[in-house]
From Swiss-Prot:
GO biological process: cell division; cell wall organization; peptidoglycan biosynthetic process; regulation of cell shape
Lineage, highest ranks first: Bacteria, Bacillati, Bacillota, Bacilli, Bacillales
Protein name: Phospho-N-acetylmuramoyl-pentapeptide-transferase
Lineage top rank: taxon: Bacteria
Catalyzed reaction equations: UDP-N-acetyl-alpha-D-muramoyl-L-alanyl-gamma-D-glutamyl-meso-2,6-diaminopimeloyl-D-alanyl-D-alanine + di-trans,octa-cis-undecaprenyl phosphate = di-trans,octa-cis-undecaprenyl diphospho-N-acetyl-alpha-D-muramoyl-L-alanyl-D-glutamyl-meso-2,6-diaminopimeloyl-D-alanyl-D-alanine + UMP
Family the UniProt entry places it in: Belongs to the glycosyltransferase 4 family. MraY subfamily.
Keywords, in A-Z order: Cell cycle, Cell division, Cell membrane, Cell shape, Cell wall biogenesis/degradation, Magnesium, Membrane, Metal-binding, Peptidoglycan synthesis, Transferase, Transmembrane, Transmembrane helix
Length: 324
């Protein structure tokens, strides 16, 4: 029965995304919600200017509808589900505001870094307040073992750091057609398996709903993309995957399963540090996916390579937790 629920969930999430797209994409075009491409980016990206953005709305709507329907039909609404939806929608709304300012108000940078950071921290604080009052644990477990360390009052600081850092890391990965959609589907799929293994079926249903939603979106986001998810989608997905890691006590494993996001972020950090200290750049451009474009790789080759890396890291994460 539970296996059927998972199958129905991924199919429903996929179909809702696929069916929404032909309606929503022309609507975005009519509103002139087109992506602006930065001039310092790869020249090959200039032709993408004007491609509809804010498509993350479709992903979020699919996740909400699928999760609610499947939970009401086969399970019951749990606090885990409420927390997952809260963070996903909260970070999605923050991303929507950022996209809206960029696209409609023509402020290229959207929200300021300070404004975005405050929004991310506020959502993380509300999440942790509910998490804490539900008597949730403050320990972090070593993957593949029963060994854990209680961080006590430091844990909320770590939660805020993980949510802010994780959502931004996922956001940085959204730079090529289909790159984030594919890597997100893989990472959420891995966490769905691990949540299922823990008998946290509500979390597994949510994770599978995300897989279905992003795969449906990928149909229209694969190269050449007809729509971009924007910060609306990338921040929502980032917040969601970190929340899953916290609820399943797999915070450390997130670094492995979400390894592509971590590597992309490290490439930006290293690039900035190197340039500020030596005046030289390590990469031709950061995040890392742009470096490979500038050394001559096709966009599709970069995307497939990163998907493959994400899949290998996801398998490694599952192996460590389940079979090691």
């Amino acid at each position: 029965m539970l296996e059927q629920v998972i199958l129905f969930t991924i199919i429903m999430g996929f179909l809702i995304s696929v069916l929404l797209s032909p309606i929503f994409i022309p609507f975005l075009r009519r509103l002139k919600f087109g992506q602006s491409i930065r001039e310092e980016g790869p020249k090959s990206h200039q032709k993408k200017s004007g491609t509809p953005t804010m498509g993350g709305v479709m992903i979020i709507l699919s996740i909400i509808a699928t999760t609610i329907v499947m939970t009401m039909k086969f399970s019951e609404v749990s606090m885990n589900m409420i927390l997952l939806l809260f963070v996903t929608v909260g970070y999605g709304l923050l991303g929507f505001l950022d996209d809206y300012i960029k696209v409609v108000m023509k402020r290229n940078l959207g929200l300021t870094s300070k404004q975005k950071l405050i929004g991310q921290i506020v959502i993380a604080l509300v999440f942790y307040a509910v998490y804490h009052f539900q008597g949730m644990p403050t320990d972090i477990r070593i993957p593949g073992t029963e060994l854990s360390f209680d961080f006590g009052w430091i844990y909320p600081v770590l939660v805020i750091f993980m949510l802010v850092g994780g959502s931004n890391a996922v956001n940085l990965t959204d730079g090529l057609d289909g790159l984030l959609s594919g890597t997100a589907a893989i990472a959420f799929g891995a966490f769905a398996i691990l949540a299922w293994n823990q008998s946290q079926y509500d979390v597994a249903i949510f994770a599978v709903a995300v897989v279905g939603a992003v795969l449906g979106f990928l149909v229209f986001n694969a190269h050449p993309a007809k729509v971009f998810m924007g910060d609306t989608g990338s921040l929502a997905l980032g917040g969601a995957i970190v929340t899953i890691a916290i609820l399943t006590k797999l915070e450390i494993l997130l670094v492995i399963i979400g390894g592509v996001f971590v590597i992309e972020t490290l490439s930006v950090i290293l690039q900035v540090i190197s340039f500020k200290t030596t005046g030289k750049r390590i990469f031709k451009m950061s995040p890392l996916h742009h470096h490979y474009e500038l050394v001559g790789w096709s966009e599709w080759r970069v995307v497939v390579t990163f998907w493959t890396a994400g899949l290998l890291l996801a398998v490694l994460g599952i192996y460590i937790e389940v079979w090691l």
